[in-house]
């Protein structure tokens, strides 16, 4: 990516998906906006931070710090939290939670595509900036996420394990006010996405693509 950025013309528009996992654990209140210090934990987040630093040297670049993505797509990422927990609700009917109070922000995959379209249509006023992209009403803990799922799968059981530690220590509340101030509004709620996943997983469970 560094080589690609060096070869770009000055007029080239660059829209880059980065990640809000770069915030790591947030401040003392776990609150993060685009000015918050970055504390990446995973190698993935560390490399995304390095890429973003190079990216923002480009005058026409925009970085989207995406929340954890969810929703049906042609080739699923079941390891992402909403997709994962909903899959477990369909197939296992239970999940064991470690550090269930840890919070994350979420965004539907179709809203991700919509924010790229929004940036292309509003590039002149958005360029040269970093934007968090997530659902402002979906800064929720793992336990709260399970409660969202349980509303649609009443027999889904989640167990809050008091012993043990989640290897993923991300815990933060993310502000999306900056991207919203440009006129971007999300369309796909957490409830809607969970319903979509439940339907999708039920349809593909016994198909050739049941492992997606």
Task: Please annotate each region the language model reported.
Residues 2-43:
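Conserved Rossmann-fold NAD(P)-dependent oxidoreductase catalytic core, especially the SDR/UDP-sugar
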Residues 4-8, 54-55, 115, 119:
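Hydrophobic positions on the long internal alpha-helix
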Residues 22, 69-71, 112, 138:
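Conserved sequence/active-site signature of Rossmann-fold short-chain dehydrogenase/reductase
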Residues 25-28, 39-65, 90-91:
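Active-site Tyr-X1-5-Lys
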Residues 92-93, 97-212:
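C-terminal substrate-binding subdomain of Rossmann-fold SDR/epimerase-dehydratase oxidoreductases
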């Amino acid at each position: 990516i560094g080589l690609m950025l060096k070869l770009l013309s000055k007029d080239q528009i660059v829209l880059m998906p980065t990640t809000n996992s770069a915030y790591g654990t947030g401040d003392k209140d776990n609150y993060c906006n685009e000015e918050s210090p970055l504390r990446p934990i995973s190698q993935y987040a560390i490399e995304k931070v390095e890429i973003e630093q190079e990216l923002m040297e480009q005058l026409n670049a925009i970085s989207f710090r995406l929340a954890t993505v969810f929703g049906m797509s042609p080739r699923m990422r079941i390891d992402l939290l909403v997709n994962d927990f909903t899959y477990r609700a369909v197939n296992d009917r239970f999940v064991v939670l470690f550090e269930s109070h840890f919070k994350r922000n979420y965004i539907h995959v179709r809203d991700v595509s919509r924010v790229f379209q929004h940036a292309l249509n509003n590039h002149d006023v958005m360029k040269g900036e970093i934007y968090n992209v997530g659902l402002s009403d979906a800064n929720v803990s793992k336990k709260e996420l399970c409660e969202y799922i349980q509303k649609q799968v009443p027999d889904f059981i989640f167990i809050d394990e008091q012993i043990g530690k989640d290897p993923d220590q991300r815990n933060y509340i993310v502000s999306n006010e900056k991207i919203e101030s440009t006129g971007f509004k999300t369309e796909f709620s957490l409830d809607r996405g969970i319903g979509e996943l439940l339907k999708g997983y039920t349809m593909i469970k016994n198909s050739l693509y049941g492992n997606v």
